[in-house]
């Protein structure tokens, strides 16, 4: 086994798979006629792990177990264990319900349980849905509620959601009727005032009304090419009874409604009298009641068709540091790859990672704000680096995050000097 150490270039060994030399990797493992580096071994392990998970995802009756679904979600989404469990059970029951419906002679009809995901911005709602799309064996589509309008007005009809599901199933109607739909930004279609309005609200309450029958179960007429319906056009008939709907939204301001309701009931010596700003948004969301959603602007019929409620928490400092470093597509790994293309190593100190997480918490943008902070820190370095020679390493320390100081640049000459001095 060769380790990363200096030596004669004539005796330099190279990985037979990626071509990197023994000086560019931590370990180089030798076979009879070939060599493999530690990075290629890790890549092979990831490939085998994915294959094993996909083959063992289903239990004996063909239904993925909630624990299996949750384990796969854990690989990509940090934290949010409660929301993962709710989603895993809901998807598992969706599969079981479909299998139960196919069995003849059953007197009990299992109703579906659509899901509402509520959490502050950047906490992982959309990522959970995208990860589900990768691991499920049913057609899956995501729709943006902000683009929807009532039928007859400029914008997308709600039937376009089903069209996207049909496209995901390659126009196989039977498969589409067993699919899952995720509607994002559902908090943006709330009615504009708490009282019913005389004027039509075509992008708010009107969309909620249009989604009601679709979510409950109806036969939707879908134009195969999309667009508006024309009398001459043939429609595809899609039964939405067995389609699972997951709705998600940040619901900005809902925490204030919950806190206001809590103030009215806080009396006596044992009452919790902490100010609402002392409690996180995620903590307040755990006390959510249907009446809060009605006050926010959802109509009662819409809330009634979303019986399963999962609230996501604010991400704390440890979770944000983990998001920066651990997932397969972690931000730190992405920027390290960018710097590798300039033949430069990028390193972050532990204190720097914690400082980045603190800045994201102060901005209240969750994990979504991490990239803008990283761009801000590395902007000048990325601007100057392509024009500089002999820079082998860039180190981001705490000062580079908390002040105007630049990341430390280590030059090849300095490394040689320290090596000879040693």
Curated annotation (Swiss-Prot):
GO cellular component, one term: HslUV protease complex
Residues covered by the ClpX-type ZB domain: 3-56
Residue numbers binding ATP: 120-127
Residues given in the record as Zn(2+) binding sites: 15, 18, 37, 40
A molecular function GO annotation: zinc ion binding
Alphabetically ordered keywords of this record: ATP-binding, Chaperone, Metal-binding, Nucleotide-binding, Zinc
InterPro entries, per the entry: AAA+_ATPase (IPR003593), ATP-dep_Clp_protease_ClpX (IPR050052), ATPase_AAA_core (IPR003959), Clp_ATPase_C (IPR019489), Clp_protease_ATP-bd_su_ClpX (IPR004487), ClpX_bact (IPR046425), P-loop_NTPase (IPR027417), Znf_CppX_C4 (IPR010603)
Gene Ontology biological process: cell division; proteolysis involved in protein catabolic process
Protein family according to the UniProt entry: Belongs to the ClpX chaperone family.
Subunit structure and binding partners: Component of the ClpX-ClpP complex. Forms a hexameric ring that, in the presence of ATP, binds to fourteen ClpP subunits assembled into a disk-like structure with a central cavity, resembling the structure of eukaryotic proteasomes.
Protein role: ATP-dependent specificity component of the Clp protease. It directs the protease to specific substrates. Can perform chaperone functions in the absence of ClpP.
Name recorded for this polypeptide: ATP-dependent Clp protease ATP-binding subunit ClpX
């Amino acid at each position: 086994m060769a380790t990363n150490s200096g030596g004669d270039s004539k005796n330099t060994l190279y990985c037979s798979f990626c071509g990197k030399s023994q000086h560019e990797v931590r370990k180089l493992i030798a076979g009879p006629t070939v060599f493999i580096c530690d990075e290629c071994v890790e890549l092979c392990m990831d490939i085998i792990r994915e294959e094993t998970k996909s083959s063992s995802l289903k239990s004996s009756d063909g239904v993925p177990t909630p624990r299996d679904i949750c384990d796969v979600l854990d690989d990509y989404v940090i934290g949010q264990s409660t929301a993962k469990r709710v989603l895993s059970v809901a998807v598992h029951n969706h599969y079981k319900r479909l299998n139960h419906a196919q069995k003849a002679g059953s007197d009990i009809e299992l109703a579906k349980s659509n899901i509402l995901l509520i959490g502050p911005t950047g906490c992982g709602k959309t990522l959970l849905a995208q990860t589900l799309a990768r691991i499920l064996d049913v057609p899956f589509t995501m729709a943006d509620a902000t683009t929807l309008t009532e039928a007859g007005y400029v914008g997308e009809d709600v039937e376009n959601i089903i069209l996207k599901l049909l496209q995901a199933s390659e126009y196989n109607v039977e498969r589409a009727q067993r699919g899952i739909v995720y509607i994002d930004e559902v908090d943006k279609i709330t009615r504009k005032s708490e009282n019913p309005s005389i004027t039509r609200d075509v992008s708010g309450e009107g969309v909620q009304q249009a989604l009601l029958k679709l979510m409950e179960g109806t036969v939707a007429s879908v134009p195969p090419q999309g667009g508006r319906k024309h009398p001459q056009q043939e429609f595809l008939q899609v039964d939405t009874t067995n389609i699972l709907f997951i709705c998600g939204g940040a619901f900005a301001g809902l925490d204030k409604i919950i806190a206001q309701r809590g103030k009215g009931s806080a009396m006596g010596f044992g009452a919790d009298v902490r100010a609402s700003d002392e409690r996180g948004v995620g903590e307040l969301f755990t006390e959510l009641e249907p009446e809060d959603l009605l006050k926010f602007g959802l109509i009662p019929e819409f809330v009634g068709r979303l019986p399963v409620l999962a609230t996501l928490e604010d991400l704390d400092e440890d979770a944000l540091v983990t998001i920066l470093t651990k997932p397969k597509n972690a931000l730190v790994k992405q920027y390290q790859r960018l710097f590798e293309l300039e033949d430069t190593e990028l390193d972050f100190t532990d204190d720097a990672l914690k400082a980045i997480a603190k800045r994201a918490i102060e901005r209240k943008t969750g994990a979504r704000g991490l990239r803008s902070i990283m761009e801000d820190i590395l902007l000048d370095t990325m601007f100057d680096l392509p024009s500089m020679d002999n820079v082998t390493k860039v180190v981001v320390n705490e000062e580079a995050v908390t002040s105007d100081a630049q990341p430390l640049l280590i030059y090849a000459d300095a490394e040689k000097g320290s090596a000879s001095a040693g």
